Amino acid sequence: MKLNRSEFQDYIHSYETDEIFYRDLYLAEKEHPETFMKYCQELDHELIASRKLYVPALSKEAWYPYVEENDMFHDFTGNIMLCKHYRYSPVFTHEHEFFEILCIYNGTAHTTIQGISHTLSTGDICIIPPHTKHNIGIFDDSIAINILVRTSTF
C-alpha cells in the first residue's frame, strides 16, 4: 500500500474497527467495573471469534503466548511488515520468532520486556529480539508502529 503524507496521517490517526471495539471494552471496564462482566457476556461472541479479538474476561487461557513467524507473515512475501499497534488492546505477554521494532510515533506506551517495565515516549524506538517475553499497553490516543522483521532477513 502506497500512501502520500496526508493519507498516512489520516490512516495513522483514524481508529480501526478493532481499535474501537477495544476502546469500548476498556472504557466499559474503567467506567463501570460493577457491570463489566455482564457487558462482556453480552458481546457478540461470533464477532470476537471471527476477528480473533482478545477479551481477557471471557478467556480462560493465555492469548497467543507464542507467535511463529509463519503465522504472522503467512500471506506476506516481504521480509519487513509495518503495522499500527492497536490502541486500547488488552495487554498480553507474548513472544515470537521474529524481530519487533516498536516505534512511538506520538504519545506514550507502557511496555514490559523480560519482566522490566519501561515507558516509551514520542520518538522512542525499542528493538525486541526473537524469543523475548514482552507486552505493550496504549490506553489513550497515542500511536505506535510495529515494524516486524523476519529472522531470516539477517
Model-derived regions, located:
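N-terminal regulatory/effector-sensing and dimerization cores
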Residues: 69, 79-154
